[in-house]
Amino acid sequence: MRNKKKFNEFMNKTIEELKDEKRYGTAHVYQSTLNAFCEFCGCKIIYFHQLNRATLKEFETHLRDKQLSWNTVSTYMRTLRGAYNKAVDQKITTGNSRLFNHVYTGVKNDVKRALEVEEINKLLNEVPLKRLPEDLVRCRVWANLMFQLRGMPFVDLAFLHKSDLKGNTLSYRRHKTGGQMIVDIPPTAMELIRQYQNTDCNSPYLFPILSGTKTGEELYIELSLIHISEPTRRS
């Protein structure tokens, strides 16, 4: 007898649980995976019995036909596998240990993502700031600070608090891991900090990247939109 329990309902429940745990990035990946799988299946209701080897292989082919990278395909497949294994553990469906063996779930490192120091210097310094639009000026300032502050991730830069700045040192916790970081600020970076630091006395943030008025999922969405739209936004 086929399992009449709905996989999409289980995925939606998992997404809400992730949001309750404030794991908004993971919840977004689960939602994107569910959307892509529903679009492939041509329906919003998906039963667990539809998760079979043939369907998964066809889904993989469908994603590649849409020009998605192998790493994106792997993300979707690993997300489906994670949800499926969780459902098996909860005895919502019976398990097939080899269900995902024939679809790609690895990570390809065939694309160079790192830049040489000379390339970074060229990007950050070749064109004078005064010749750039205001939105690109801000983007380059943030990139310059991230580079000078020991490769600080953008999310950590955005969440820096005014209280994290102590003289010529930044003392803060990594947003993703919670690990304590202490960074000495080079003179050139300090000059940028003084020039572009937040002037809003009501905001706790060191830089005017986040509004300071949002929390939880709204804050995650705000940061995501800034990360996507900053290079093309016009004042």
Predicted regions span which residues?
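Major-groove DNA-contacting interfaces characterized by cationic-aromatic clusters
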Residues: 108-109, 171, 192-225
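Single conserved hydrophobic/aromatic residue that forms the stacking wall/gate
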Residues: 226-235
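Flexible interdomain linker/hinge and immediately adjacent N-terminus
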Residues: 57-58, 93-128, 211-218
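N-terminal DNA-binding recognition helix of tyrosine site-specific recombinases/integrases
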Residues: 36-39, 49, 65-99, 150-152
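Basic/aromatic-enriched alpha-helical hairpins
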Residues: 2-66
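Conserved catalytic core of the tyrosine transesterase superfamily
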Residues: 27, 65, 114, 129-144
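Conserved tyrosine-mediated DNA breakage-rejoining catalytic core shared by Y-recombinases
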Residues: 101, 149, 159-195
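A short, glycine-centered helix-capping/turn motif at helix boundaries
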Residues: 145-156
